Curated annotation (Swiss-Prot):
Its EC number is 2.7.7.6. Residues 1-227 are annotated as: Alpha N-terminal domain (alpha-NTD). Belongs to the RNA polymerase alpha chain family. GO terms for cellular component: chloroplast; DNA-directed RNA polymerase complex; mitochondrion. NCBIfam families: PRK05182.2-2, PRK05182.2-5, rpoA. This is DNA-directed RNA polymerase subunit alpha. DNA-dependent RNA polymerase catalyzes the transcription of DNA into RNA using the four ribonucleoside triphosphates as substrates. GO terms for biological process: DNA-templated transcription. It holds the Pfam family RNA_pol_L. Residues 242-311 are annotated as: Alpha C-terminal domain (alpha-CTD). The keyword Transcription applies. It comes from the Eukaryota. The N-terminal domain is essential for RNAP assembly and basal transcription, whereas the C-terminal domain is involved in interaction with transcriptional regulators and with upstream promoter elements.
Length: 311
């Protein structure tokens, strides 16, 4: 195993309190970059949880198609504005907040009376404008969850007096990664992984990365610690029986071949590793403009990245 290292290349706040971080993971073995990158991306976007407003009760309002006298926005517009409020909390229990404002006034998120432990990341976020002396009174339901929940999924009988919101719980908004090959003095290949994480500001990219890594560790720890595994029934895998099926759907772009080799393969309608494996070395070299040098490059890449040898 190489001496893997990780460092933060960039950490910055962008508009509306959102955050961006870029990380570099060095000294990975060939093939590990895409494995780690894909796994982290899935967990960052799908498994990390957060707190959000899931429902509201507005005084004098029974359905979302109503209007409030003296308030510029209708109820649908107010609900849409409330979806943009970003919250953070260390408490995962359902909690309630309250807002009561008399006009004329511009109503923003910082006017909400929050429950203990809940913090609003974008306090200047706009909610509504009251143009008369009327009162706008709203009760907020704060819930912890993960992913994206439609308003229809949030409804429970006890909430019949509440208006449900489409709720975005996930604190990570976007994840990108790219892999670069590094050659040492003896022409051995290692990989480095660049990982970019954008969050809504309720969690830092660094904390998000640590949390995602911990989720993955916990998952595989369960497999390691499973005492119900019957050691007597372990399968002994022999090299010749290893399946290459998991690699067949990998696009040839992931192999990061030279432009010449890549273009020749694409012109021959070879789009995936699975397509490539249908060719013997001799048949591969029969492709138009595909010389010995390109063939050697493909053979070497398949062996070093995926452990596959064409026969």
């Amino acid at each position: 195993m190489n001496n893997i290292s990780i460092k933060c290349l960039k950490s910055e706040k962008i508009q509306s309190g959102a955050c961006h971080g870029q990380f570099l993971i060095n000294s990975l073995n060939p093939g590990q970059g895409i494995t780690i990158g894909n796994q982290l991306r899935r967990v960052l976007l799908g498994d990390l949880g957060g707190v959000a407003i899931s429902a509201v009760r507005i005084a004098g309002i029974t359905h979302e198609f109503s209007t409030i006298p003296g308030v510029r926005e209708d109820i649908l517009e107010i609900l849409l504005n409330l979806k943009g409020i970003i919250c953070t909390s260390q408490i995962q229990d359902t909690q309630f907040g309250h807002l009561k404002v008399q006009g004329p006034s511009v109503v923003t998120a910082d006017l909400i009376q929050l429950p203990p432990g809940v913090e609003i990341i974008n306090p200047n976020h706009y909610i509504a404008t009251i143009s008369t002396s009327n009162i706008l009174e709203i009760e907020f339901k704060f819930e912890y969850g993960s992913g994206y929940h439609l308003a229809s999924q949030n409804f429970v009988e006890e909430d019949e007096n509440y208006l449900q919101l489409d709720t975005i719980f996930m604190p990570v908004q976007k994840v990108d990664f790219k892999i670069e090959n590094i050659y040492d003095a003896t022409n051995n290949i290692s990989e480095r992984l660049f990982l970019d994480i954008w969050t809504n500001g309720s969690i830092s990219p660094n904390d998000a990365l640590e949390s995602a890594a911990q989720v993955i560790i916990d998952l595989f720890t369960l497999l390691i610690n499973n005492k119900n595994i019957n050691n007597n029934n372990r399968l002994e895998l022999k090299p010749e029986t290893i399946s290459i099926e998991p690699y067949t759907n990998i696009a040839i772009e992931e192999l990061q071949l030279s432009v010449r080799a890549y273009n020749c393969l694409k012109k021959a309608q070879i789009n995936t590793v699975g397509d490539l494996l249908q060719y013997s070395p001799e048949k591969l070299q029969e492709l138009k403009n595909f010389g010995r040098k390109s063939a050697d490059e493909v053979f070497s890449t398949l062996k070093n990245k995926l452990g596959i040898i064409l026969k």
